[in-house]
Design a protein with these regions (language model features):
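Extended catalytic cores of very large enzyme megasubunits
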Residues: 1-127
Length: 127
């Protein structure tokens, strides 16, 4: 049985506005469709067809367990293309001009970037 009920209006708003995928002409997914997309694109390819994932799916639907919400949000082509989209944040020292390229790419994937501009790193930019 699929549970599409989220206990509070706030939870329903967050799930719909942050994690549900938008489809032209249909609108946004409901909670069960978001969970199904995650299971189809992230979990099942990793565990294989021989493993029954219905208990895990029901636990996610019932909010008993919660996977990476970034992975739930980007499950599908975006996450398959580059797993950077599955992370909340990243870090890099700014010690090479390429760090700026890397930071931009990571940000475009929707992942936050922390960085260090400590003297020992920044001095390497001059070389």
């Amino acid at each position: 049985m699929r549970n599409n009920y989220l206990p509070t209006d706030y939870q329903a708003f967050i799930a719909k506005s942050r994690y549900a995928k938008y489809f032209d002409g249909k609108g946004r997914e409901d909670w069960s469709e978001t969970v199904s997309r995650y299971m189809t694109n992230v979990v099942r390819p990793k565990v294989g067809a021989e493993y029954n994932t219905s208990q895990l799916e029901q636990a996610i639907l019932g909010l008993e367990v919660m996977p990476s919400m970034r992975a739930m949000m980007t499950a599908g082509p975006a996450l398959a293309r580059d797993n950077t989209a599955g992370y909340n944040c990243s870090y890099l020292p700014v010690d090479d001009p390429k760090a700026f390229d890397e930071a931009m790419f990571i940000l475009l994937c929707g992942t936050g970037v922390g960085f260090s501009v400590e003297r020992q790193f920044v001095q390497r930019l001059r070389s």
